[in-house]
Amino acid sequence: MTASCWTICLFLLGSVTEFIVLASPEVNESQQQHPQNVYHDIGVTRNKIVTAQFECYQKIMKDNSQDRRGPVCNRTWDGWLCWDDTEAGITSEQHCPDYFQDFDPTEMVTKICTESGQWFLHPESNRTWTNFTRCNLHTTEGRRTAMNLFYLALIGHGLSLTSLFISLGIFFHFKSLSCQRITLHKNLFFSFVLNSIITIIWLTAVANNQELVQQNPISCKISQFIHLYIFGCNYFWMLCEGIYLHTLIVVAVFAEKQHLMWYYLLGWGFPLIPATIHAVARSYYYNDNCWISSNTSLLYIIHGPICAAMLVNLFFLLNIVRVLITKLKVTHQAKSSLYMKAVRATLILVPLLGIQYVLLPYKPSGRVSAEIYDYIMHILMHYQGLLVATIFCFFNGEVQAVLRRHWNQYRIQFGSTITQSDALRSASYTASSITEVQGCYSIDGHTEHLNGKNYHDFDNAIIKPENPFA
């Protein structure tokens, strides 16, 4: 595909995605015409509390209470949370509920069972009391952290877009870089460009718009579908890079030409399958909040194939390294050394892009440690485009050699142009001075000598310096 085709596709997809996300007039008009939508939050919270209360009373009735020994505080529902039987003198605790936006689920709620086997009574109200004060103790800090993470993501995708566009410009401009491996690089970069654009639109137009998320219109679900599809394309194009190198080095033994159609089907076509299955499943289960909620195992439909692709890719790359090391020991071929450099970049990149899935299940429960974890995960997730462009383009030896060669040519041309213009000015000044002298003294023979061959030789000697780098 030419650069103009890539540009047109990028413009159309970005415009369509932004239109899908932003063009939801039915939501805004319904909010203006129906004031009860303002209380949508209250309705959702009430439903959560009623559901939790129903489950608590079922649990209270089913649990066996015959094996109690000593004074025990009875199981109870305090209005928000369910508490099991607790021994006297013990402080029971559990995580804060997610009923309200300013509640931090990582913080803990406590309820004291006194030595007498009664739940603690608040001295002012003389009623049983549960300590929820820590749930919104760090609300301001949490909001500040959320905004920092939001801007960190935007900056990351902005830097990624800048570096990716520069890299694509280099690949398209310098025809000497054109080969099948660079074509795969272009598709990989283009998938990361689309991912950054759609993520920026998603963060600013959907995730940052709570009213839109609660209304759950079809437009934001479509944008989430596109987002997850492009997200999968990133990793399957990385798999294409690994398969290409494996076929080139291990299977086809340095054969340069391969059929790229299969790579296009794998990189752009296959991610449609898990994205479609996920969309159908979410439409039947967890069909809420624009499909943003992550408390569902349905996300394994997306993450499972991605993890499988990365494991297969890692296996291919390790096998390639094994083959290349063997070839280098036996033959010491320069070509094997060059391929080793190409493999090294991919081998470094695959773990860096996949480490987030290793860390994903291990989010710490503490507030500070969870905040550090969020910062690390945001850097790993939202700066991937910058990382890919840096390793595959800016650190690429071929790209550096081409840029260095063109820079030296530019310096030579620019330097020779300056030297030539200075020489022409000097020759013109010399010729005009001689002409003036000839006019004053009327020495015709000398004039003919200067305007003849000897003069042109002098001119050429001035224009063509011995040192071409001067």
Curated annotation (Swiss-Prot):
Disulfide bonds join 56-82, 73-113, 96-135. It is found in: Cell membrane. It is a multi-pass membrane protein. The chain crosses the membrane at residues 148-172, 184-206, 218-246, 261-281, 298-322, 338-359, 375-395. Residues 24-147, 207-217, 282-297, 360-374 are extracellular. It holds the Pfam family 7tm_2. GO terms for cellular component: plasma membrane. Glycans are attached at residues 28, 74, 126, 131, 295. InterPro entries: GPCR_2, GPCR_2-like_7TM, GPCR_2_calcitonin_rcpt_fam, GPCR_2_CGRP1_rcpt, GPCR_2_extracell_dom_sf, GPCR_2_extracellular_dom, GPCR_2_secretin-like, GPCR_2_secretin-like_CS. Residues 173-183, 247-260, 323-337, 396-470 are cytoplasmic. May function as G protein-coupled receptor for calcitonin-gene-related peptides and adrenomedullin. Specificity may be modulated by accessory proteins. May activate cAMP-dependent pathway. Belongs to the G-protein coupled receptor 2 family. This is Calcitonin gene-related peptide type 1 receptor. It comes from Danio rerio (Zebrafish). The gene is calcrla.
